[in-house]
Regions:
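Fold-level signature of zinc-dependent metallopeptidase catalytic domains
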Residues: 80-255
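N-terminal helix-rich structural modules
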Residues: 1-134, 138
Length: 255
């Protein structure tokens, strides 16, 4: 919600004060859309007085244009440019008004610390090794802002519960598709239906090895590429449920 529009939190507080039927209805739809714009109606506003949905979400400085940010990025040194265009940073203004990249681990420090605590508690409660590994590594990633190890752990999941938690989709950043939005969905693996797919899943690597693609983009040998069937129990944030790791060193293999 905070990543979609800077005014969302204040608007939410205002909606919570409206106890009328219309107010309750607006609140419900606001929570579904994570903002005052209907995603099913080309982002048309359904609450009076709000601006158009910001194309850059809340990832870039207030008052900045796409051209402003683009020109700033173009003038950066390679390392700074990589940070500015990375999945896990916002762009803000420093005390002097100049643009700077801020890691998610700092931008959302309070929320991520709380989330990491919940993930560590869940890891302590499970007896499933790959699930424990993912939850622990994802908790660490929220604090360090380095998601690679936890993305690998996610792709190695072999547990009855299939969690996807973290910054994944970039469609909220309509300016550049640089910035990943946080989302979570929790699913339970359907072992009976998954078993029916094993006949095909066991051949995926064989098929990929014969495709005319560079070795660099092939699935790593230690990643399980078999398809799984899951029942989705809970979804938070987006209206879509793709959820692959955004790290360019990885690619999704789960269905």
């Amino acid at each position: 919600m905070r990543q979609t529009w800077a005014g969302n939190e204040m608007l939410l507080l205002k909606l919570l004060e409206d106890s009328t039927l219309l107010g309750r209805t607006r609140l419900d739809y606001f929570l579904v859309n994570k903002g005052p714009w209907s995603r099913l109606d080309d982002d048309a506003a359904f609450i009076p007085g709000v601006p158009e949905k910001p194309a850059g979400g809340n990832y870039y400085p207030a008052g900045a244009t796409r051209a402003d940010v683009e020109a700033w990025i173009a003038g950066l040194a390679p390392a700074a440019r990589e940070a500015a265009t990375g999945f896990f940073t916002t762009i803000r203004r420093d005390a002097g008004g100049k643009f700077m990249a801020v890691p998610y681990s700092l931008e959302y420090q309070g929320e991520l610390a709380e989330m990491a605590g919940h993930l560590r508690a869940a890891a302590a409660a499970t007896k499933q090794p790959t699930l424990k590994s993912f939850l622990e590594s994802r908790a660490a990633a929220l604090i360090s802002n380095d998601y690679y190890a936890s993305d690998v752990a996610w792709m190695k999941l072999d547990s009855s519960i299939e969690p996807t938690i973290g910054p994944y989709e970039v469609y909220e950043d309509e300016w550049f598709n640089y910035k990943a939005a946080f989302e979570a969905f929790i699913a339970v693996r359907d072992d009976a239906e998954t078993a029916k797919l094993d006949r095909f899943g066991s051949e995926l690597q064989w098929l990929e090895d014969r495709l005319p693609i560079e070795v660099l983009v092939r699935t790593p040998d230690d990643i399980d590429s078999r398809a799984k069937l899951i029942d989705l129990l809970e979804l938070a944030h987006g209206m879509e449920t793709e959820g692959p790791p955004p790290d360019m060193r990885l690619k999704p293999r789960e269905s």
